[in-house]
Amino acid sequence: MDKFPSVLLVTKTTGYQARSFGDAAAKLGVRLIFATDRCDHLEDPWRDHAIPVRFHDESYSVRTIFNELKRTPPAGVLAVGDRPMHLAASVTQVFGLQGNTVEAVGISRNKLATRQALKAAELPVPWFRAVSVDSDIVTL
């Protein structure tokens, strides 16, 4: 078992924010593990020891992450971006960690669904109504 807790960061290789997370993790004494959409045919092209994932193939990616981390599971999972967020929710579920559910992530990616969920939970939400893109703007 590692001396320091680890956190999995699911992100795109092009995400500039990843380095900021790395700096923060180092300051906190947390081992940051990357899961990125880097090329899985080259040997660690970014030299970050990232687990290669495919955002378009979630079941493959969840399996890959699980197989890589099952001996020393992460203490938490973070995500940067829409597609990484969905994968992170699935990984969180597989490891039995607390975090956003896949359903909640799906809702958060849709403004109407988000507002409906907030309203159903009796939380403050601005007035809204759903309209078709074909609606006559004058009659609205």
Residue ranges and their predicted role:
Residues 1-104, 132-135:
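ATP-binding N-terminal substructure of ATP-dependent carboxylate-amine bond-forming enzymes
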